[in-house]
Design a protein with these regions (language model features):
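Hydrophobic N-terminal alpha-helices or hydrophobic patches in metabolic proteins across all domains
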Residues: 1-207
């Protein structure tokens, strides 16, 4: 699924990685898109903001893969530029997603984990989301990244989720029972976003 080597990973670590991948996927495909849709709507661009966000995320993944290609590697400068642009574009959506998780989960624990542990992740934007998720659910996230599987003829591939530099975040050991809690957290956040969109639409119509 994620092209990583999980052959010698304990069960709890596999559960942890599934939670991390799933939460980040929900952000990149749903909540980040909604955030940029709202930004685009406020700027009078309609749904262009949502399209812009998805294209930016895709471009970053594309150039990251091209950088590792053995036959036609891309320019390292271009890859760095795409990564830096993505960090800027994803800065606000990552924090709106983390705030949404905090509102529908354990607010104080999520904010505390956000403030104290987000910086321990190599990717600060992903770190904000994962730290807030860990606090909102009371589950232990973060730790060593899985080793990616390189395609034939390609060099090492960067990990999809950056690991924590040191110990894991505090919380319960990840279990399969946490999957239903993650699903509930995501659905409650979707409902929160829908409510926000309804309020924005009413404000626009009545204003």
């Amino acid at each position: 699924w994620q092209q990583v080597d999980a052959s010698s990973v304990p069960r709890s670590e596999i559960v942890r990685h599934v939670i991390e991948y799933s939460v980040l996927a929900a952000h990149r495909h749903v909540f980040g898109v909604l955030a940029w849709f709202c930004i685009g709507a406020l700027l009078g661009l309609g749904p262009a903001g949502a399209v812009f966000f998805r294209n930016a995320e895709y471009a970053t993944r594309y150039w990251r893969r091209k950088e590792q290609a053995a036959d036609q590697p891309s320019s390292p400068a271009l890859c760095r530029a795409a990564e830096q642009a993505w960090q800027l574009i994803n800065w606000l959506p990552a924090r709106t997603t983390a705030l949404g998780f905090a509102i529908v989960g354990s607010f104080e624990d999520a904010i505390d984990a956000w403030r104290n542990h987000a910086a321990r992740f190599a990717d600060r934007n992903d770190g904000v989301i994962l730290a807030a998720t860990a606090g909102a659910l009371g589950v232990r996230l973060g730790g060593t990244s899985l080793r990616p599987l390189a395609p034939d003829g390609a060099g090492p591939v960067p990990a999809a989720v950056a690991g924590v530099a040191g110990d894991s975040l505090p919380g319960e050991v990840p279990r399969t029972a946490h999957f239903s809690q993650v699903v509930g957290l995501v659905w409650r956040t979707v409902a929160l976003w829908l409510l926000l969109l309804v309020l924005l639409t009413l404000a626009h119509v009545l204003g």
